[in-house]
Amino acid sequence: MKEALTSLFEKVTKLPTTSGCYKMLNENKKILYIGKAKNLRSRIKSYFLEKKSHKIKILMKNVKSIEVITTNSEYEALLLECNLIKTHKPDYNVKLKDGKGYPMIRITHEKYPRILKTRKIINDQSEYFGPFTNVKKLDQVLDFINKTFKIRKCKKKSNAPCLYYHMGQCLGVCYKENLEKEYQIEVNKAKSILNGNISEILSQIDIKLKLAVQKEDFETAIKLKEMKSSLIEINQIQIVTKANNLNIDYVYVHPGENVNTIIVLKYRDGKLVERDANFDESICKKDELVLQFLIQYYTSINMIVPDKIHIFLKDVDTKNVEKLINEIKNTKTEIIYKETKEILKIMEMAISNAKLSLREYENKSNKALESLKIFLEMDKLPKIIEGFDIAHLKGQETVASMVTFKMGIPFKENYKLYKLNSLLKGEIDDFRAIKEAILRRYSEIINKKLELPNLILIDGGKGQLSAAFSILKSLKIEDKVKVCSLAKKHETIFLITNKKGINLPQGHPALRILQNVRDEAHRKANGFNKKRREKITLLYKKIDGVGEKTAQKILKLIGTYKDILPLSENEISEKIKVNIKLAKRIKEFAIKENSIKNIDNDK
């Protein structure tokens, strides 16, 4: 328990000192507690101090990981905390009741709009500003707007002017007609202030403030000073919660040397509820990566597609991607790009979170590689790992794959696929297959004077490991590169120097790296084998009378056209259970295919 907390504390000491929110999670990734902080590192470190309340002690016993979202200000962190708690309802947080969020300013969608305070968003085309954490200051600003601009307060039409009209605070729209243009001017003035255009108003307040001080009217001076403070505070650009009913995702790509970080900031009902960090190796250009990511991310089975997807890339054609997502998911989402003051602030937050996520990701990879180095008794960090796997279907079309990982991340530019030639048709010999793949790969590296990997991973057990090592030894590079194997049954790691095997706990970062390499090699080998088989069956289907099932039978029970050549028509008929006429056509096809290949080889 103490060791786990010590490890977690080490990660906390590397957190940023900026403002933001943090999520404490248990071993099942369930969120236990959400908090905010002006200084994330300092606040989270306080949970590890000896003097803790009983409740915090219980909480910390269950905390296995901590995630953070950075913000541009403490104010944004406060609002974000509220939204996250409402969304996730963690066990250790106070449960906020629905409808009791922070207040907003609403400009109603009416002939003569009213300006009101509200805690609920109504989908009636009203305009909303906020929310605002300081209710007192919000009330002061509303009072200022109502007294400065002639906005109606009455809800119903009247036959006589109200008190506000007589006080000069209303145009009298409750009983007068045709005041739309004049009234809209007053509304626009109020909107201008709420949109942050307050410099002129502040100048006027400063003049009045000086006059009040000169007259020693300190009561008025205090009110004017409070009003100035309120206007400044509520007109801070608020980017964590945007008061509208849209569900919108902001997708930002942060390019890196070895890996790109893709951050998705998710707003639901106008509220930021989640930061999703994704990582991809740096092969594609930025615009290509964004388009590929959008397709893979938003067409996945469990992904809810928002109303709009905002990308931070200009002049990228997203029409086809948008159409594809909408067709697959039966939605009407829009992929957009805009440049506004508010969106630039969101981009700043996305960049901050992307950098943080990348640091966390790289720290995890480095620690995992350090562990792997120790377990495998290596002198150097396994920065470059090459993984091998063999695939076949009952000895047919045996192939090998070689994948490369750099710093724990796939490096696809370096992948290799091998069609193996050392095995006879139908022969299953993984050891000989491994030998051929290793020989071809490392003979090429030696001849071309390329860089050797730090570690070679073989999918298999002791036999496969010995086969690979024998080739490395024959090439005289057995001392220059470490080789190990990973057996699927118990995920046991075998070394030449330790054939008893190493069994790491499931989920161990070092084991996970090896599993990722093994699984990627497995995926590539199986994909190549399948592609080879599909190519052959496609050829067989050109034969008159051969469909998919018969083509599969020929491949499975006989093999390629070369395997057909030595067989008689009767043997073909008997092996795949077809009539003699079809067997004859199959034989003729094989002879023709062979002659074409021979002509091609002579050219």
Swiss-Prot record:
Residues forming the GIY-YIG domain are 17-94
Q: Which domain of life is it from?
A: Bacteria
| InterPro entries to which the protein is assigned, alphabetical | GIY-YIG_endonuc, GIY-YIG_endonuc_sf, GIY-YIG_UvrC_Cho, RuvA_2-like, UvrABC_protein_C, UvrC, UvrC_RNase_H_dom, UvrC_RNase_H_dom_sf
Q: Which UniProt keywords apply?
A: Cytoplasm, DNA damage, DNA excision, DNA repair, Excision nuclease, SOS response
Keyword Zinc on this protein? no
SMART domains cross-referenced by the UniProt entry = GIYc
Q: Which GO terms describe its cellular component?
A: cytoplasm; excinuclease repair complex
Q: What is this protein called?
A: UvrABC system protein C
- The gene that this protein is the product of is uvrC
